[in-house]
Amino acid sequence: MKSRNLLILAITIFLGITQSSCNYNAFVTAEEEVNKAWSQVENVYQRRADLVPQLVSTVKGAAEFEKSTFEAVTEARAQASSIKLDPSQMTEADLQQFQQAQDNLSKSLGRLMVTVEKYPDLKATANFKDLQAQLEGTENRIAVERKKFNEAAQSYNTMIRRFPKNLLAKIYGFEKRPYFQASPEASQAPVIEF
């Protein structure tokens, strides 16, 4: 009778350890999906940052006196490129700071494109058209990769918050991941005047 109770206890402990390790592995897999998605976000933002100097130099040749616009784009690019985040340590505040820097670069690029409207000869050049198409494609990829990051973070966050896995997640130190959110300006419809 005593050996039977020991056997049941040993099996219960073994199953508990096995279940715990399976949950841990699931947490690690989900966390790595978030890290992978973040790497792709950084990749497309870097692609955009790499296009900016080419775009600025192309426009600069045709619009020499638009110096303040070029400086604003260059400064915004430098700021956006300087923020590096570790996805495993990322907080809501870190992500907001990163997003703000990227939003500033987007706004500066928007002002640059408005400046270009004053120069029809520049808009007609093949080099500018190519750079503009690449930038538009990159902006679309940014939106896609941000969405994928949010999906991976949502899946991970759901996993670590569901009972009973949330108990193990706390023991193992798995923390909630932040999401990309729309900038405050996105909630306001743009004013279009004809």
Question: Across the structure, where does each feature detected by a protein language model lie?
Answer:
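A helix-centric hydrophobic-segment signal that preferentially recognizes long
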Residues: 2-194
